[in-house]
Regions:
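A short helix->beta-strand "capping" segment at the edge of beta-propeller domains
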Residues: 25-42
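Flexible "stalk/tail and boundary" regions
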Residues: 52-55, 85-86, 90, 113-121, ...
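A short loop-to-beta-strand structural motif that recurs across blades of beta-propeller domains
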Residues: 69-74, 78-83, 130-132, 182-185, ...
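Loop/turn residues immediately N-terminal
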Residues: 63, 128-130, 181-182, 287-290, ...
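Beta-rich, blade/repeat-based domains predominating
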Residues: 41-54, 68, 99-121, 151-180, ...
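Short, conserved, GDST-rich strand-edge loop motifs in beta-rich repeat architectures
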Residues: 59-78, 225-235, 327-338
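Short loop/turn segments immediately following beta-strands, especially the blade-tip
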Residues: 134-139, 241-249, 345-350
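Beta-propeller fold detector
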Residues: 35-38, 92-98, 142-150, 193-199, ...
Length: 363
């Protein structure tokens, strides 16, 4: 779910003391240096990011109810995109994802499997309740439907179930965040079922603001996920975790970190997150336009700020830098801000699970 709280509650005074971080002029970058990695063409509004061996994949969500709820949001009839870039930020391929006319919701999470080149795939979360599978590194037809929300939520769009982010476990299952508020498990054959529900992970507005970003920790034993704007801790952004067991209970839910919502300021609004090898957790804050850094125990140890940030949404490691998508959540949008930014953080990312999903291509 995406939401500029200012668009819902009205204009609020907000003038945080941010320390801008721009790319260092020296050859050795400093922690927090920010530069432009790539420019995103229309329809813009980059959300998801995934880093492959020699490609960077970016998903878009130009359709956006939450850009301006009072007017019905930003409507998009031109489809969404998955853009492929090389490691230098050059656009090399574009895949069009068809959407409904005047769509008000698009794409977010991306996950790569570990299949060899002949059967390598990208899994794409459509926030209207689908997972699409896109064949990579070969000629292929349009993306195929891999999974969708089951009854009674099927066919009702994001109002009933919004699949935001997705991440593989070591067995090839996909775990999905849904801000209605639920967490889902999708088996390797595409069967989706609710894995966890609890009123404490609901967003402030009930139908919005709940689970958004999700990643598995270095131990492989916990799913960490963000709450954009909490109802249980009103206005705060929260990082929770759950053990990766078959049926987690309410007592299994653990608070990792709470981002306070100071009175008179736009709430922080957590979006995507990413783990470093060290166990540090990087969290995009789209309200304050910052990246927060938590240590493995959940204590905040740093904030990265830059005037280049505009709704820093998706996060993925490339070397010792984070790639960060500028979602540009506002109406009207600012095309000049449709960027993928590169943030030097001085440590490497945790390798994501990339299971084999097919035996084809073996020799």
């Amino acid at each position: 779910m995406k939401l500029r709280i200012i668009a819902v509650l009205g204009t609020m005074a907000f003038a945080p003391a941010l320390m801008p971080a721009l790319a260092s002029e020296s050859t050795d970058p400093a922690i927090g240096d920010v530069s432009v990695f790539a420019t995103v063409p229309a329809p813009g509004h980059p959300f998801g990011v995934a880093v492959d061996k020699n490609r960077i994949y970016i998903s878009t969500s130009a359709g956006d109810f939450f850009a301006s709820p009072a007017t019905g949001g930003h409507l998009n009839s031109d489809g969404e995109r998955v853009f492929a870039y090389d490691k230098r930020g050059n656009l090399v391929k574009t895949t069009v994802i068809a959407t409904m006319p005047k769509s008000d919701m698009g794409l977010f999470g991306l996950a790569l499997d570990g299949n060899p080149t002949a059967t390598h795939n990208l899994y794409v979360a459509d926030m209207n309740g689908r997972i699409l599978r896109l064949a990579l590194d070969r000629d292929a037809p349009a993306p195929e439907l891999f999974a969708q929300v089951p009854p009674p939520y099927s066919g009702l769009g994001w109002h009933a179930s919004m699949w935001n982010d997705l991440v593989f476990d070591g067995e090839g299952n996909l775990f999905m965040t849904d801000d209605k508020p639920r967490l889902w498990k999708v088996t390797p054959d595409g069967h989706a079922s609710i894995w966890f529900e609890d009123s404490r992970i609901a967003g402030l507005f009930g139908f919005a603001g709940g689970p958004l970003g999700g990643r598995i920790d270095p131990s492989g034993e916990f799913l960490y996920f963000t709450i954009t704007i909490s109802g249980y801790f009103p206005g705060e952004a929260v990082v929770y975790r759950l053990p990766l067991v078959d049926h987690p209970s309410a007592s299994d839910l653990q608070v990792v970190h709470r981002f306070p919502a100071p009175s008179g300021q736009i709430p922080p609004q957590a979006a995507g997150l990413a783990f470093a090898e060290s166990g540090n957790i990087y969290v995009g804050l789209i309200g304050t336009n910052q990246i927060a850094v938590l240590d493995p125990a959940g204590n905040e140890i740093r904030r990265i700020s830059s005037p280049l940030f505009d709704s820093p949404w998706g996060l993925a490691f490339m070397g010792q830098s984070l790639l960060v998508t500028n979602a540009d959540i506002q109406e009207p949008g600012i095309p000049a801000n449709w960027k993928v930014l590169k943030v030097f953080v001085g440590e490497s990312g945790l390798a994501l699970n990339r299971p084999r999903t097919s035996d084809e291509g073996d020799h």
